[in-house]
Regions:
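Conserved beta-strand signature within the Rossmann-like core of class I S-adenosyl-L-methionine
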Residues: 104-113, 309-316
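Conserved proline-anchored active-site loop of SAM-dependent methyltransferases
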Residues: 77-88, 212-216, 274-287
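Conserved SAM/SAH cofactor-binding pocket of Class I
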Residues: 4-63, 192-279
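Conserved SAM-binding loop
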Residues: 49, 109, 235, 314, ...
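Class I S-adenosyl-L-methionine
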Residues: 129-166, 317-350
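A short glycine-rich, Lys/Arg-flanked "PGG" loop and its adjoining helix->strand segment in the class I
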Residues: 91-103, 296-308
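Mobile active-site "lid"/loop adjacent to the S-adenosyl-L-methionine
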Residues: 240, 276-303
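SAM-dependent Rossmann-like transferase core, predominantly class I methyltransferases
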Residues: 135-208
Length: 350
């Protein structure tokens, strides 16, 4: 077994292979979990996971790993963590890990050196005290001593609150602000590419629309604020944490428009029949499955989701070669604007 598919996952489990830690008979909770060959190499009795990103959650389910239930009071002798790169989100996840520990339990984490491993290690040490450590696969692995309780409950509570959705003031957003949280794409600002797309939307849109990769809902709020003849709008988003924010941001429109919120992997396709689709597609994925092909998959999903004659409105990094994919799935592909390193395109579904 090699570590090329997910070095951090392989590194995370190394202490059990090396005899540095024992796997608890009562099982473990895995926060930020990802599937990979390291999890298939041997049994991990009682392992359950939580993962808010849909394609990563789907991969864990396909591999046969059990999702954690919703029981908030369950406590674990071991909590595994693959912290995200965004520091506030990672701190919140560490605080959640400590809160989920049974008395005498440990937190074990790993992160790539190139993705903030030293900062993550320092943060867990600040929260939980001295750590055991090792280096493997260009990653840092670090774990707490057995903990009777969080050593610094005040800091743990402060960091746990970092994950709470909060109001962000921004005059470009509908109503002068929006609800978001750390770790969501462009969590504390209106993304420049999305703002460029909004500036070049047409004078009229109507009927059923969708946003593929909706994030916290900026494009959706702008569309619904501008176009009273839109009757239904669906938001498709892979990150459940972002989708929860979008639900709050779309509340002002809920009585006028039929809204749908879908925790969904757009790359696998979406239902059809839309009159228009707006999209600021990701050009990379999460974790070891990151790939430039993801944006192209979004364009193919949009082509299949639109009724014949339906229109796509797209913004993307200027250098990304999406023209061939657009030409394959659409007619009348046009570039509406180029600015700030981005391009806005529109295309008509065949």
């Amino acid at each position: 077994v090699t570590a090329t598919d997910d070095p951090a996952l392989h590194a995370l489990l190394r202490p059990f292979h090396d005899g540095l830690l024992d796997w608890p008979a009562e099982g473990a909770l895995f926060l930020g979990a990802r599937a990979g060959t390291a999890l298939q190499a041997r049994p991990w009795p009682g392992l359950v996971w939580r993962q808010p990103v849909k394609p990563l959650a789907d991969a864990l389910q396909r591999a046969g790993h059990a999702a954690a239930g919703d029981e908030a009071t369950r406590r674990w002798p071991l909590v595994l963590v693959l912290p995200p790169r965004q520091r506030e989100q990672a701190r919140a996840l560490f605080a959640q890990a400590l809160a989920a520990l049974a008395p005498g339990g440990r937190v074990l984490a790993a992160a790539p050196n190139a993705a903030g491993a030293k900062s993550a290690e320092a943060d867990l040490a600040r929260l939980a005290g001295p750590l055991g450590t090792l280096s493997k696969h260009h990653c840092r692995v670090f774990w707490t001593a057995p903990l009777a309780a969080p050593p610094d409950p005040r800091l743990a509570a402060e960091w746990a609150a970092l994950d709470a959705p909060r109001r962000i003031a921004d005059p470009r957003a509908h109503g002068g602000g929006f609800v978001s949280r750390p770790g969501v794409f462009a969590w504390d600002r209106v993304d420049a590419a999305s703002a460029l797309l909004v500036a070049h939307l047409p004078a009229e849109l109507a009927g059923r629309g969708a946003d593929l990769g909706a994030g916290w809902g900026y494009l959706a709020t702008q569309v619904l604020a501008r176009y009273p003849r839109v009757t239904a709008f669906d938001l498709y988003e892979a990150d459940a944490r972002a989708l929860a924010c979008a639900r709050e941001n779309l509340v002002p429109f809920a009585t006028r428009v039929t809204l749908g919120f879908h925790w969904h992997d757009v790359a696998g396709g979406v239902p059809g029949g839309y009159d228009f689709v707006v999209c600021n597609p990701p050009f990379h994925g999460e974790g070891p499955d990151a790939r430039p092909e993801l944006g192209r998959a979004f364009l193919r999903a949009a082509a299949a989701a639109l009724r014949p004659g339906g229109r796509l409105f797209l913004v993307a990094n200027r250098q990304l070669p999406y023209e061939r994919t657009l030409a394959e799935g659409f007619a009348d592909v046009r570039t509406l604007a180029q600015a700030g390193g981005y391009k806005v395109c529109t295309a008509v579904a065949r």
